[in-house]
Regions:
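Active-site phosphate/ATP/adenylate-binding loop shared across adenylate-forming ligases
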Residues: 1-29, 34-276
């Protein structure tokens, strides 16, 4: 095992123990999270209106808290976008993930707090790498670059210190500097809104790098990989990146794309890791 992989496993050892605890005690961990959400929800106007402070059990939560659609709580979200705090969550939300509006004509704005990014969106990739290195201790994936294909919605200013955009663009904008050393393309290229231009620049940048993993939605990544093949004139991805070994994917069913990926990445050592 490479020295860097040993260091990675050592660095993530505490987190791996936490993940093992989640597996062994799922009900306890979920109850703890339930209490955390209730305690913070009770500090908000939304939670006070629904009497969250008086909720003691999950059954009481189900009985008292109705199911809301976006339109029902849009007024609360609009107030959050204007900078009000303690409306839906105690922490101020300065970032808003902008959806494509699939269930209506207007885009939807999902508040994203810094704590939410740190405890979920930023922790998730670390957990993936920790689990992968644990499952495959002889991996060399950390010795190369990870190629990421983010969204194409431009980051827009919503007002004083408020920003909105595609969730992946928000995460790229807030990624720690050290992570950018291990990832391509550079932030400027990753945030280009025009998909064709972005893929062209990725093709130019990535073919000169030692890419060993990539991540994103299967459909768009397949388009990107085929563009890279066209750009280089190669038959398959291994001719460009011989050490490619991992695709971390999510967002849609991977099964319709499996055969196409195996065709352009004909390696028995290639791993596909789905996230949810």
């Amino acid at each position: 095992m490479a020295a860097i992989t040993k260091l990675i496993n050592l660095y993530f050892s505490d987190r791996l123990r936490e993940i093992d605890y989640f597996r062994e005690h799922p009900a306890e961990v979920q109850e703890r999270q339930f209490r955390y959400l209730l305690a913070n929800g009770a500090k908000t106007e939304f939670g006070r209106d629904l009497g969250m402070k008086g909720i003691a059990t999950q059954q009481q939560f189900r009985d008292r808290i109705p199911i809301y659609d976006y339109e029902t709580i849009s007024e609360f979200i609009d107030r959050t976008r204007r900078g009000e705090r303690h409306v839906l969550w105690p922490e101020e939300a300065k970032w808003f993930a902008k959806s494509s509006g699939t269930t209506g004509s207007k885009s939807k704005y999902i508040p994203v707090t810094l704590a939410g990014m740190r405890k979920s969106h930023m922790r998730g990739p670390k957990d993936i790498m920790a689990l992968y290195c644990h499952l495959y201790p002889k991996t060399s994936v950390v010795n190369g670059k990870m190629l990421t294909l983010g969204g194409s919605k431009r980051i827009e200013r919503e007002g004083d210190n408020m920003m909105s955009g595609d969730l992946s663009a928000i995460l790229i904008e807030n990624t720690p500097a050290i992570a950018n050393i291990l990832r391509i393309p550079d932030k400027k290229t990753a945030l280009i809104p025009d998909f064709d231009e972005k893929v062209r620049l990725i093709s130019e940048q990535s073919t000169r790098q030692d890419v060993r993993s990539f991540t994103g939605v299967p459909s768009w990544n397949l388009v990107m990989l085929n563009r890279v093949l066209e750009y280089t004139g190669k038959e398959n991805i291994l001719e460009i990146w011989p050490h490619m070994e991992l695709f971390v994917h999510g967002g849609m069913d991977f099964r319709p794309y499996q055969a196409q990926y195996r065709k352009i990445i004909p390696s028995p050592d290639m791993h596909y890791m789905e996230t949810y």
